[in-house]
Design a protein with these regions (language model features):
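NAD(P)-dinucleotide binding in Rossmann-like oxidoreductases
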Residues: 66, 76, 83-143
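A structural signal for well-ordered alpha-helical segments within the folded catalytic domains
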Residues: 35-38, 42-49, 143-147, 164-173
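Rossmann-like dinucleotide-binding domain that binds NAD(P)(H)
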Residues: 6-88
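Alpha-helix N-cap/helix-initiation motif
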Residues: 37, 138, 159-162
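Short glycine/proline-rich turn/loop motifs
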Residues: 23-31, 127-132, 149-157
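Basic phosphate/pyrophosphate-binding loop/patch that engages nucleotide-derived ligands
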Residues: 1
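C-terminal helix-rich "cap/oligomerization" subdomain common to oxidoreductases
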Residues: 75, 152-173
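Short, well-ordered loop/turn and helix-capping segments at boundaries between secondary-structure elements
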Residues: 14, 53-54, 112, 155-159
Length: 173
């Protein structure tokens, strides 16, 4: 395949060609990304924003810690843990730790929910079997982002994740 590396770099700082700086691994260099937090974070943290009813807002505070590659293969952290504090003292934990659970964990008084792009788990498992009440938050169902976007255009309404919601979810990253 032919790659116009100068075109690919665009407005990013000029760097000598390095195969690690193009797809997929470009995500691990500060010039182009902030690692898995900005790669997958928008997907996971979008669920947080929905679930907490904060699509038009965000966390009040963020605290975290990170570890970088000892060999310095990449620039961004190889491991991180973040704690987001939302109104009403709600805490959301998000992290990446070398192939283990990368996703979002909700902690409540009755247990925990873990959500990633493939699954939802509960501790205790019975939490997932409890029916939702009339006032409980119900998230939109979307099996195909592109189809939802095209349907919204045809119907003249906003998609499940409009530009403002997407912006706020990305900002949380």
């Amino acid at each position: 395949a032919n790659l116009d590396y100068d075109m690919w770099l665009g407005p990013a700082p000029q760097r000598p060609y390095n195969a690690k700086r193009v797809h997929y691994l470009f995500r691990f260099f500060w010039d182009y990304s902030a690692g898995q937090l900005t790669n997958f974070g928008a997907h996971h943290l979008d669920i947080v924003q929905w679930g907490l009813g904060m699509d038009n807002s965000g966390p009040l505070a963020v605290e975290g810690t990170a570890r970088f590659h000892k060999q310095r293969w990449y620039e961004v952290p190889e491991w991180f843990e973040l704690t987001y504090t939302y109104p009403n003292n709600i805490h959301v934990l998000c992290g990446q730790n070398n192939g283990t659970r990368g996703g979002v964990e909700f902690q409540g008084t009755r247990g925990k929910l873990f959500v990633d792009r493939r699954r939802i788990e509960a501790d205790p498992p019975e939490l997932l079997k409890q029916p939702l009440g009339d006032k409980d938050t119900r998230l939109p169902v979307s099996t195909n982002h592109h189809a939802n976007w095209l349907e919204a255009i045809r119907a003249g309404r906003l998609p499940i994740c409009d530009a403002e919601i997407g912006h706020r979810s990305a900002t949380v990253c």
